[in-house]
Each structure stands twice: as structure tokens, then as C-alpha cells.
């Protein structure tokens, strides 16, 4: 495979008080998980080119001593990587390798995006052995999760529905494009994130409807942000104002997503109580609908 040209490789230093090992030894609160994590983040774009998508960026925790699981994320309809880029930096700061990508066409539908997600998983696994890879020998190839926004979220569900054996968790946010679809074959823990006033993918026909079909996905969780629009879990600092979150809930959705990945990718059981124990009122008061099966 031909290598695409490198745009840049930088380290983004995250200022954290104390020694990193000390910070990660304790189970933080959901509120703390919602903030930037303890690891320094590096990212690069020198990745093998594949036919399923165009450009891609790999974020990873540069100073994490242990090996790490991987997360691949698809943007939504007529979106680019920049619309989900905050997830890459944020999740890497909490200890995960993350790939975001651009679809071949901005209007690619969910099945093509699902193919792209699967190809991205293969790429991330390949980085574990590729000469010149900055994460060579560091990726836990059997610990993969999929995420995505809008049609990318529907794609994450499609992949989980058809290829659950390839992943350990799925986190669709504001999934759209597959109205009233059935995802009963999903067999991995799935966190569904939605916005109460999503006008582009109304929850009763999309996210909430999808969640109700996840009869084989246990555990599963549905969190619907009160007053949230279609873009609540997307990057806030984008040029097109119409693609921005209408309220700032990054700490809320981020904290829940990190806890989900810590439990189901990393196998850290101490996070189970955070997710399925008594939820703090400062969390539940931000949700218009919250349900789970553990």
C-alpha cells in the first residue's frame, strides 16, 4: 500500500499535576473523566492509503507505558474529520489510540461508512506491526471500539450488527440516516448518545428507536441530552456554525464515553459502578431520557 504524505506530527502536551502513574491509579469521577486526561497526546497522518476512505489521523497517548486499545470514528453526512477531531485528542489523553478519517465522498451513506470503519480497524491493527509506525508493538489488536456521528453513528451500529466479533464496544452519537432500523444482532456493549431536540435525526425514529432494538447488546445504555441538538457530541470550534453543538456537554458525553471504553475495552471493572451505580444528580439533571440494561 502506498503511503499518503505526512502533514505533520506533533506532540500536544497536556499539563497535569503530579505523576502520570499516580493519576491513572485511582478511579476518577465521571466529572473528572470529562476533562482532558493525564497523557500527552501525539498524532500523525502518515498512514497507508486504502480504498474505503481518504485521509486519516491517528492520535495516541505518547507517554503511556502500557499497551492500549483502539477506537475508530466516522464523521457524519457532509462532515469531515474536523467535526469529530476533539474526540481523537480527548480519548487519546485518556489512554486510547484513535483514528478519525474523511470519507471518500461527503455524502457517503451508512453502509459505505461501515465499510470504512471496518477498514480503519484493520489499519489500526496494521499499525501495530508496520515498520515506521509510531505505535508499533503498542496496540491491543483485540480491543477495538467503533464510534460515529449521524450517518457515521448509524454506520457504527451497522458494523456492530454485522461484525460484532471485530469489536468490543460501540458508541453511536446522534445516529441518523437509518430510520427505525433493527440492530438486534449487535452483540457488544453499546452506548447510544442522543440529543432531545435533534431535528435532523429525531430520536423517536433514530437513536431511541435504535436503542430499543439492541436486545442482544448487553450491557447497553441510552443517554439523551436535554435540549441537545444534532451536533452535541461534535467539535465546537468549526467554521460552519450550523454544525456546532448548541450547548456545551462535552464533559458529560466525554466522561460517559471514557468510562464505557475503560470498562469494556480495558476491562477495568472499577468503572462499572460509575456507569451502573447511582448516577450523580449533576449528570441526570442534564438528561431528558436515561435508560440502561446491565
Residue ranges and their predicted role:
Residues 10-18:
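Bacterial N-terminal signal peptides
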Residues 26-66:
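N-terminal cap/lid segment of alpha/beta-hydrolase-fold proteins
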Residues 66, 111-154, 162:
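Gly/Ser-rich "nucleophile elbow"/oxyanion-hole loop immediately N-terminal to the catalytic nucleophile
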Residues 67-76:
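Short beta-strand element of the alpha/beta-hydrolase
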Residues 82-102:
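Short amphipathic alpha-helix adjacent to the substrate-entry channel of hydrolases
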Residues 165-175:
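A conserved short beta-strand
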Residues 186-188, 193-255, 259, 263:
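Active-site-adjacent alpha-helix of alpha/beta-hydrolase-fold enzymes
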